[in-house]
């Protein structure tokens, strides 16, 4: 199936690999600066997610928030983040990723300030919804711009740094939040964990305006100016010229609404705890997905540019890589959720001890990400298979440690060693799969493709957390004492292994179809 980008624009690469040029300006831009600006907001968003668990008790106390309020503090951000990814990715591809990145970061920063100033739980949740939209706006632009301005091994290294930032941010978030709350006290502390994003966000916007090439935006502006000049020349000569046509921007509003509603219907039942009519939304979501696919096909057949060109899925590397990511997130994101429940409720560990037990995992994950990034272009899919095997081994050995804790009373700190195996696998898989899944996607669709993949990950996270914690509490409820928590831990980790085995099958199939890496060096696009 032929794949034709709707819009094309060029960027040229100078002899210095760090420098790039774009049409419409004599300025030279540095990739290293672009990457710094792209990754800092990613860290901000992940710290906002990982630190909120530590802040919840103080939020509950100072705002007199109900359990439902607290649930939406957690889920509201994730929900609006998830439904924003694909529309924002498409808008960035069409209108320009640089400006959309800045706009999303500004929305995120202002919403963070509003969270910190919220006088009650209701306004806090509204601000969290907006914060999620902002993060969902700039996240796909990050992947799209890495896809646009880096190629081959350098792109793999950029995505490896992306993985390092992810691992570091997830680990630092709870520790940073705990330190801030302890330093400033309950009333000011949790608010400061939100407000701290505001100055960093404004700095990021300022640096983006200075350091981003804005290649697409310059190309669109140049085309408008050329059209106006040609129209003015024709008018000046006295010739009869047609009215200057308005620039046509096709964002496929119907397709956008259908997909947003479909993702909302799929994620909401799992985030709200299900029950009653909530599960009927899943059926509605299935119908909406079918309607969306039919609409996108019809829209393209009419010669229009659909929000997601379904030809994206004709790239085996993209469709298989997205399947690996979605099924991996289905299981892996619950690893530390279950650990926290088991340690604090079953073993009586403190929140600080629970946070610290994950630090070795984050450290080795960061190193594994950088190691994999240097080898992705030659051995990427073997790395993915090996990484999944390590995570499965780490999960299985964690169950063995839990059994030893129950039977012989060994220290729960032994879990940090088995979770390090999981960290090695998580870091290696993230760097390699991120690069290879987008390798064949045209750069003009980098944001859309990144948004689709991230949406699959968000859905996997929502479904997996609900399913696996349900298994955990289901087994805890039929027993008594510490043994019941151990049984729940083992059952939940067994469910995680099943999800990871599905991801492993998808990864093996991906290597069989696509080989171990790109068939040839990636061409300059």
Sequence positions of predicted segments:
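Transmembrane-helix exit segments and adjacent C-terminal regions of multi-pass membrane proteins
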Residues: 2-34, 194, 207-213, 248, ...
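Transmembrane-helix bundle of Major Facilitator Superfamily
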Residues: 2-210, 470, 474, 497
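12-transmembrane solute porter fold
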Residues: 31-54, 303-515
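Structural signature of transmembrane alpha-helices in multi-pass secondary transporters
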Residues: 45, 74-77, 81, 132, ...
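A residue-level signal for alpha-helical anchor/packing sites in multi-pass solute transporters
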Residues: 58, 145, 149, 179, ...
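Interfacial loop-to-helix junctions that mark the boundaries of transmembrane helices
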Residues: 69, 122-126, 187-196, 249, ...
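Transmembrane-helix signature of multi-pass solute transporters
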Residues: 107-117, 134, 200-207, 287-291, ...
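Hydrophobic transmembrane-helix bundles of small-molecule transporters
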Residues: 182-183, 187-323, 331
């Amino acid at each position: 199936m032929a794949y034709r980008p709707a819009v094309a624009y060029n960027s040229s690469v100078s002899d210095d690999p760090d420098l790039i040029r774009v049409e419409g300006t004599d300025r030279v831009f540095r990739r290293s600066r672009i990457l710094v600006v792209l990754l800092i907001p990613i860290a901000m968003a992940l710290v906002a997610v990982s630190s909120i668990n530590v802040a919840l008790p103080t939020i509950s106390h100072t705002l007199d928030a109900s359990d439902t309020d607290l649930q939406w503090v957690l889920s509201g951000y994730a929900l609006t983040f998830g439904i924003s990814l694909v529309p924002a990715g498409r808008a960035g591809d069409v209108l320009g990723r640089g400006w959309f990145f800045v706009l999303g970061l500004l929305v995120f920063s202002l919403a963070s300030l509003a969270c910190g100033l919220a006088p009650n739980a209701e306004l806090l949740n509204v601000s969290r919804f907006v914060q999620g939209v902002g993060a969902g706006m700039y996240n796909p632009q990050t992947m799209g711009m890495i896809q646009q301005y880096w190629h081959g091994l350098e792109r793999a290294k950029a995505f490896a740094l992306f993985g390092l930032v992810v691992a570091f941010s997830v680990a630092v978030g709870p520790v940073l939040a705990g330190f801030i709350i302890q330093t400033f006290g309950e009333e000011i502390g949790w608010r400061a964990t939100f407000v701290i994003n505001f100055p960093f966000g404004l700095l990021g916007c300022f640096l983006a305006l200075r350091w981003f090439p804005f290649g697409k935006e310059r190309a669109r502006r140049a085309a408008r100016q050329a059209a106006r000049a040609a129209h003015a020349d024709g008018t000046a000569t006295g010739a009869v010229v047609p009215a200057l046509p308005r620039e046509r921007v096709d964002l496929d509003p119907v397709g956008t609404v259908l997909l947003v509603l479909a993702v909302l219907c799929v994620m909401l039942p799992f985030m709200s705890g299900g029950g009653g009519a909530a599960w009927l939304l899943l059926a509605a979501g299935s119908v909406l997905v079918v309607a969306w696919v039919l609409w996108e096909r019809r829209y393209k057949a009419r010669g229009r540019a659909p929000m997601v060109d379904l030809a994206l899925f004709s790239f085996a590397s993209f469709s298989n890589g997205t399947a690996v990511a979605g099924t991996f997130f289905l299981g892996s994101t619950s690893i530390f959720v279950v650990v926290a429940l088991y340690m604090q409720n079953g073993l009586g560990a403190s929140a600080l001890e629970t946070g610290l037990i994950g630090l070795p995992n984050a450290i080795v994950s960061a190193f594994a990400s950088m190691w994999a990034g240097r080898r992705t272009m030659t051995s990427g899919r073997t790395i993915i298979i090996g990484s999944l095997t390590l995570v499965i081994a780490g999960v299985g050995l964690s169950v063995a440690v839990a059994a030893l804790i129950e039977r012989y009373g060994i220290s729960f700190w032994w879990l940090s060693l088995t979770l390090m195996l999981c960290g090695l696998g998580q870091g290696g898989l993230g760097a390699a799969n991120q690069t290879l899944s987008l390798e064949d996607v045209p750069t003009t669709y980098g944001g859309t493709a990144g948004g689709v993949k991230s949406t699959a990950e968000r859905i996997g996270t929502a479904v997996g957390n609900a399913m696996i914690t349900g298994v955990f509490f289901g087994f805890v409820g039929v027993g008594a004492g510490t043994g019941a928590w151990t049984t729940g831990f083992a059952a939940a980790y067994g469910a995680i292994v099943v999800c990871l085995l599905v991801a492993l099958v998808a990864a093996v199939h991906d290597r069989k179809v696509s080989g171990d890496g790109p068939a040839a060096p990636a061409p300059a696009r």
